[in-house]
Amino acid sequence: MTGAARRPRKLKVMSASAFANTFAGNPLDRASDRRVDAAWMANRLAAPESLAVAMWNGRPLIEDAKSGGVQIAYLRAQMAGELSEGGERLLFMGLWKDVAVFALDIEGPADPADGPLAGLGRFEDLRSIALTLTAGDAAILATAKGVFEWRRRHRHCAVCGAASEPAEGGWKRICPSCNAEHFPRTDPVVIMLPVNGERCLLGRQAAWPKGVYSALAGFLEPGESIEEACARELSEEAGLKASAVRYHSTQPWPYPSSLMIGLIAQVEDGEAIPDQTELDEVRWFTRGEADALIRGELADARAPGAMAIAHQLIKAWANGG
């Protein structure tokens, strides 16, 4: 192969939610039923029309898009297979109509764009380029990054410690010693905007960039419902009591493996007191101030960037949601 593969056409994505955050909206058919068919997988990997996404140390191979921004620089899957160390570094991503799409995980200090992938694109940090990608490309890359991050952290069996082996297109690892099966993990996180009348509460940590305020958040614990986790986090971090919890949207967040569950939480009257562990400061914002915050018009405060679900929660409430 002498150049990057042609780019597939855009697929219209149907979602159960009216709102899709950055990294949501993967346009591929995951075709999970095909993962167990090793012969089918090998056939598709060898097919000349099959494509592959390449990632080096978590950074995707991208190229400039003619319409502006950047896009995935697809490889031929055959080439990815040749670089995959016998399949250890391959992931079957799914189907684009009848075209199989794989992902290749490359590790090491040497930039492959200066070696075997020279002239095919460049590797850049996913978080830095996320908003310059199409929603579909960002979601595809987030999926690959999330699975590869899991693979790096779970190369050995959690039961007996033996080195595990990939199976089912990279979506499972099996221990050859005790036969334990391991699957990619997803850690649910509740992230909520506390609201009391015409004001919302945001918090900040001293380690954050100066002036940045964000929604409150915390990991869901075993045995908790989403609503219970939201109420617990509000009580722990800000001393507030939730009276009602409303779902907004979710966001896959592959750093390394979170699913952000966005909520609007009605809270009872009371003094908001930061716990000084998770939050160093909390501050109430009126609806007008929240709108100005999102627009970057407050002199002493800033919102998280638009790719963050916290930004979208604040924006939705400021706009009357």
Residue ranges, per PLM feature:
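Nudix hydrolase/Nudix homology domain
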Residues: 3-154, 165, 209-213, 275-321
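Short, well-structured beta-strand/strand-turn elements
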Residues: 165-168, 239-248
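Surface-exposed, charge/polar-rich loops and edge strands
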Residues: 224
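Cys/His-rich short segments
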Residues: 143-193
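Hydrophobic alpha-helical positions that pack around
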Residues: 216, 230, 234
